Amino acid sequence: VLLVAPVARGSGGSYVALNLAAAFAFDETRQVILVDCNLRQPCLHQRLDVEVRNGGLVDYLEGRVDNLADVLYPSGLARLTLLPVGTRREASGDLLGHARMRGMIDSLRSVAEKVTVILDAPAANASPDTRILATMTDCCVLVAGYGRDTPAAVQSASAVLDPQRLAGVVFNRVP
C-alpha cells in the first residue's frame, strides 16, 4: 500500500498518484486499486471520467454500503480500478482513522499478492488526514511542486510522516 501526498494543495499529488497507478497497471501480472482519500476535494473520478453511481469510500466507511466491491469502479484502463470518495465530507479525520478504514486497507492488501493499492491523500500541510493514512501504509511519497513548494514546506510536510515509511519526494511540473 502506497500513499501519495502533495506537500500543499496544487502540488499535483492526484496527478502523480493517477500516473503511478497507470504505470503499475501496465504490468499484466498486477492489479491496481487507486483510492481517492481526499474527502474534501476529490478529483480522480472526474479525471478518469467515472460515473459514481453506488457511492464510494465515504459511503463504505459510514456503513451505507456493505460490500466494498459495490464501490469499486473500472477506470477505463486495463487492470486499474478506482475507489472514489463518493459522498463528500468536510470532517474527515475521524472517518479515515476509523477501524473500518484500517480493516478495508488490510483486506485490500490481502486480496492477492499482485494487487497494488495507491492512496491519493490530501495535502500533508493542510490536513491531519495524511498523517492518519500514513500509519496504515507500507510507504509514502511526497509530491512537491517544482518552483512552488519551498524546502521549508517540504521539510514540514515530511515531518508528519514516519521517516521509515517515506520513500522519497517527487518533484512535479519540472520545466
Residue ranges, per PLM feature:
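Acidic-aromatic/histidine active-site loop/patch
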Residues: 1, 62, 173
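Residue-level preference for the first positions of well-ordered beta-strands
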Residues: 1-3, 31-33, 80, 116-118
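Glycine-rich phosphate-binding P-loop
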Residues: 3-19, 25
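Residue-level signature of catalytic and energy-coupling elements of molecular machines
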Residues: 4, 38, 60, 83, ...
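A short, flexible beta-alpha/helix-coil linker loop
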Residues: 9, 41, 87-90
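Amphipathic alpha-helical interaction surfaces in cytosolic regulatory modules
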Residues: 17-22, 135, 139
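Phosphate-binding loop that captures ATP/GTP phosphates
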Residues: 20-85, 147
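Conserved catalytic-core segment of NTP-binding enzymes
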Residues: 94-175
